């Protein structure tokens, strides 16, 4: 972690840091100068540092460009929001030497991208990280443990068991809980905000995108049974956000009736409750195969480059002012 106090450091110092924290002296600088310094430091940061969170009091426009989630997050008022972050999978289809949530993605473990984003959102009351005890001492996790909002839970045999264990870790007065796969590190703050807003209004919401490919059904894996109507099909993502008690009741109902569920909102559907579809982003892919890792790196690099171009334009505008 690198701190700025007065004069900007050189480029190579910034590029050695994983994240950037600006500790400025407001009494000695005007708001305009603070904005210039923040923009300059953000520009010097590597393009992969997309989720760097500068702590600076500046204009809303500057804060948005700096991608400071705590500055722009707008979670529902009068709601206590928590996350259950599922990081207990083995990722066998990735064919790697370790679970996919610990694979390197542009110099950081996949799970680190998740945590940096979620812990930067001030409106989140608690984050329950569902992860095996053997991985909780990994070096990159140490810097997050000082945040009192982060607690741990043990994975279960199945996804449902892991979610239930995670639910046990949220506060009793939590009103909305988001279930999120650690293997989806590309989710954006905007998508999270919109899904929370829909869940607050409808009690259950899930990120989803319209299905692009033509989907055919087969009952034997050899011949086509029928072609499904693509206009009615949605590709479901995470986070999936619900009222905690609704989710608990859904699990009880599914267990009693021995119903198979494939995701979290399915248990709500089985009780006849409506689930709001929040239109997400196609870039919020789940890392499942080696090819997905390549795509994810490309997306992150593109985001970083676009961010730096926007920052450069903002900086030029500030420098032209008298």
Q: Language model features by range: what are they?
A:
Residues 45-77:
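N-terminal mitochondrial targeting presequence
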Residues 294, 298-322:
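Left-handed beta-helix
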Residues 186-278, 318-322:
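Conserved core of the sugar-phosphate nucleotidyltransferase
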Residues 134-140:
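Short, charged/polar "capping" segments at the starts of alpha-helices
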């Amino acid at each position: 972690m690198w701190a700025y106090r007065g004069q900007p450091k050189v480029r190579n110092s910034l590029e050695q840091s994983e994240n950037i924290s600006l500790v400025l002296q407001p009494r000695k600088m005007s708001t305009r100068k603070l904005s210039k310094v923040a923009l300059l430091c953000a520009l010097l940061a590597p393009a992969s540092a997309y989720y760097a969170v500068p702590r600076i009091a500046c204009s809303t426009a500057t804060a948005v460009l700096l991608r400071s989630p705590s500055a722009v997050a707008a979670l529902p008022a009068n709601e206590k929001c928590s996350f259950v972050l599922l990081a207990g999978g083995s990722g066998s289809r990735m064919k790697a030497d370790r679970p996919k949530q610990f694979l390197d993605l542009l110099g950081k473990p996949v799970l680190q991208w998740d945590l940096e984003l979620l812990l930067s959102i001030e409106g989140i009351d608690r984050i329950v990280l569902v992860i095996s005890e053997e991985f909780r001492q990994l070096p990159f996790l140490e810097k997050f443990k000082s945040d009192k909002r982060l607690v741990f839970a043990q994975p279960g045999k199945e996804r449902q068991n892991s979610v239930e264990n995670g639910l046990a870790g949220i506060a009793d007065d939590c009103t909305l809980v988001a279930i999120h796969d650690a293997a989806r590190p590309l989710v954006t703050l905007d998508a999270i905000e919109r899904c929370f807003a829909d869940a607050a209004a409808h009690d259950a919401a899930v990120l989803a995108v319209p299905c692009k490919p033509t989907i055919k059904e087969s009952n034997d894996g050899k011949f086509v049974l029928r072609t499904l109507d693509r206009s009615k099909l949605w590709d479901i993502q995470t986070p999936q956000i619900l009222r905690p008690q609704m989710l608990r009741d859904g699990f009880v109902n599914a267990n009693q009736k021995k119903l198979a569920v494939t995701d979290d909102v399915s248990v709500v559907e089985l009780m006849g409750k409506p689930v709001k579809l929040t239109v997400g982003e196609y870039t919020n892919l789940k890392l499942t195969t080696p090819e997905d890792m390549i795509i994810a790196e490309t997306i992150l690099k593109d985001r970083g480059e676009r961010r730096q171009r926007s920052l450069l334009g903002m900086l030029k505008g500030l420098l032209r002012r008298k």
